Curated annotation (Swiss-Prot):
Comp. bias intervals (Polar residues): 367-376
Functional note: May play a role in the formation and regulation of the tight junction (TJ) paracellular permeability barrier.
Name the record gives this protein: Occludin
Gene: OCLN
Residue ranges constituting the OCEL domain according to the UniProt record: 414-522
Segments on the Extracellular face: 88-140, 196-244
Length: 522
């Protein structure tokens, strides 16, 4: 008995099947056997159609983008508040500080008259000598905060209201481009803002370096108390706490835009790899609540079927437990379910008299007939025709190809143990090795056939988004898409898929037996 828990068989991982684990002992072939390295499986070998991406969750990549955009909105408001609170101290200087006829109102310094000798400094941006105007730097910072606020608000609103535009790859490409541009501009604005609010940081490279340093040096060295301090000059030379907070928030916005780019790229890659039917943009509530009045319904049904012979005691267990049925719909040969226990007593009347509109149908459970076979609700492929593409039904979000007993419990493991018991000799190991190679080739051939259908469906799904719905290209692609969906829903496809999973379980068991034998020898 294997120690593996009762669950689905492990996914086939090519890197685990290394040839050196299955090579024969050196004492048989003298160490001269060379095995060709095994190539990796195709990208769709892990059944991507079985995986569902829950993009409505806040922890998913689109959800993280929503969170980051919300944080950018808050940080932009904080930057606007911090920068705007320091604008009042800029009215005492500006263009007249380093060039103009008025001069800075710092009594007796003569700094304004000195600046007038060098000519007029530009009031917006940069003047002579590479000097950065604080008002221009703050205006640049406020403008970028406003642009980032608008962009983040658009991203947040379009994703929260779950618009169709926000569910396309083109939308996330736009998010990447806008985030990259705004991130670069915010970085430039933050650097310019640092130079504007900290004049000593730019004084070394400007013509007014010595004058700026002489004016601001008094605030950087300890001075006697009681002296008059000009508040305008103080706020010009010293970085205020609000300005420091704005600088930090500016760099945090840059990091937030970088993270948005990362998760937008991740979202586009997932949308390219998986089919649209595998992505859930809205939360579904199918199995959250139990159907109403189930007990009352059961009582009514029981009252109407009193003269029907009672089924055997283990019949309910066999119906309720999917482990009692194999993939072809027949009962497995499990020891505690012999054929005589359920073929001797007819029970189909109970099932046939149930109303078709019963609440149990909402569960989409298999319906069993008298022969022991079961019927599963048919899945409708999403129609892609001349009209707009219909949305995927709620039931199609969930895999209706149930994993039955032959695939999910340890019955199949017991079958493999009976067919491939633990290895006791090198000759038996070689036999297992040959069976493994044969099964592996069959698995790879069968898997590649299934992969071609999945990849072709994914390619056609992307093409349908690019074509105009009434064009000939769209109609041709839609016909091919619907044909492949019918092929994928056929019994032959499901049979091959189940056989592929059984081969995967067989290869995993053989690998375990060989590994156990090699560990015992060592």
């Amino acid at each position: 008995m294997s120690s593996r828990p009762l669950e689905s068989p492990p996914p086939y991982r090519p890197d685990e099947f290394k040839p050196n684990h299955y090579a024969p002992s050196n004492d048989i072939y003298g160490g001269e056997m060379h095995v060709r390295p095994m190539l990796s499986q195709p990208a769709y070998s892990f059944y991507p159609e079985d995986e569902i991406l829950h993009f409505y969750k806040w922890t998913s990549p689109p959800g993280v983008i929503r969170i980051l955009s919300m944080l950018i909105i808050v940080m932009c408001i904080a930057i606007f508040t911090c920068v705007a609170s320091t604008l009042a101290w800029d009215r005492g200087y500006g263009t007249s500080l380093l060039g103009g006829s008025i001069g800075y109102p710092y009594g007796g310094s003569g700094f304004g008259s000195y600046g007038s000798g060098y000519g007029y400094s530009y009031g917006y941006g940069y003047g002579y000598g590479g000097y950065t105007d604080p008002r221009a730097a703050k205006g640049f910072m406020l403008a970028m905060a406003a642009f980032c606020f608008i962009a983040a608000l658009v991203i947040f609103v379009t994703s929260v209201i779950r618009s169709e535009m926000s569910r396309t790859r083109r939308y996330y490409l736009s998010v990447i481009i806008v985030s990259a541009i705004l991130g670069i501009m915010v970085f430039i604005a933050t650097i310019v803002y640092i130079m504007g609010v900290n004049p000593t940081a730019q004084s070394s490279g400007s013509l007014y370096g010595s004058q700026i340093y002489a004016l601001c040096n008094q605030f950087y060295t300890p001075a006697a108390t009681g002296l008059y301090v000009d508040q305008y000059l103080y706020h010009y030379c010293v970085v205020d706490p609000q300005e420091a907070i704005a600088i930090v928030l500016g760099f945090m916005i840059i990091v937030a835009f970088a993270l948005i780019i990362f998760f937008a790229v991740k979202t586009r890659r997932k949308m390219d790899r998986y089919d649209k039917s595998n992505i859930l943009w809205d939360k579904e509530h199918i199995y959250d609540e139990q159907p109403p009045n189930v007990e009352e319904w059961v009582k009514n049904v029981s009252a109407g079927t009193q003269d029907v012979p009672s089924p055997p005691s283990d019949y309910v267990e066999r119906v309720d437990s999917p482990m009692a049925y194999s993939s072809n719909g027949k009962v497995n040969d499990k020891r505690f379910y012999p054929e005589s226990s359920y073929k001797s007593t007819p029970v189909p009347e109970v099932v046939q008299e149930l109303p078709l509109t019963s609440p149990v149908d909402d569960f989409r459970q298999p319906r069993y007939s008298s022969s022991g076979n079961f019927e599963t609700p048919s899945k409708r492929a999403p129609a892609k025709g001349r009209a707009a593409k219909s949305k995927r039904t709620e039931q199609d979000h969930y895999e209706t190809d149930y994993t039955t007993g032959g695939e999910s419990c340890d019955e199949l493991e017991e079958d493999w143990i009976r067919e491939y018991p633990p290895i006791t000799s090198d000759q038996q190991r070689q036999l297992y090795k040959r069976n493994f190679d044969t099964g592996l080739q069959e698995y790879k051939s069968l898997q590649s056939e299934l992969d071609e259908i999945n990849k072709e469906l994914s390619r056609l799904d992307k093409e349908l988004d690019d074509y105009r719905e009434e064009s000939e290209e769209y109609m041709a692609a839609a016909d091919e898409y619907n044909r492949l969906k019918q092929v994928k829903g056929s019994a032959d496809y499901k049979s091959k898929k189940n056989h592929c999973k059984q081969l995967k379980s067989k290869l995993s068991h053989i690998k375990k037996m060989v590994g156990d034998y090699d560990r015992q020898k060592t």
